[in-house]
Amino acid sequence: PMTKVLKADDINKAISAFKDPGTFDYKRFFHLVGLKGKTDAQVKEVFEILDKDQSGFIEEEELKGVLKGFSAHGRDLNDTETKALLAAGDSDHDGKIGADEFAKMVAQA
């Protein structure tokens, strides 16, 4: 579970901050949830949890549920938020976010 890598308090704070549709900001979320400053291995571990189908990529459908990946209380992102998140992370434009792309997003947050 995510709490193996991140503090439950931080996760809850971050989920609460973006409970309203249309408010999601991945950079702020990564800071609030405590992902910034984690080791490469820990960031990879978070990526693997979010990669529900273990394909090596976080696809659009998985991005939509990214907050649920952190907490059962998370909401689905709306289409605009999902597409913005994908656009921000998908540097090779293949329609999904790989582990390296995810690590880069965290580093740039």
Curated annotation (Swiss-Prot):
The family database entries (PROSITE patterns) matched by this protein are listed as:
EF_HAND_1 (PS00018), EF_HAND_2 (PS50222)
Top-level taxon: Eukaryota
One Gene Ontology cellular component annotation held by this UniProt entry: cytoplasm
Cite a single GO MF annotation: calcium ion binding
CDD domains membership: EFh_parvalbumin_like
**Would you identify the family this protein belongs to, as annotated?**
Belongs to the parvalbumin family.
Name under which the protein is recorded: Parvalbumin alpha
State the organism named in the record: Triakis semifasciata
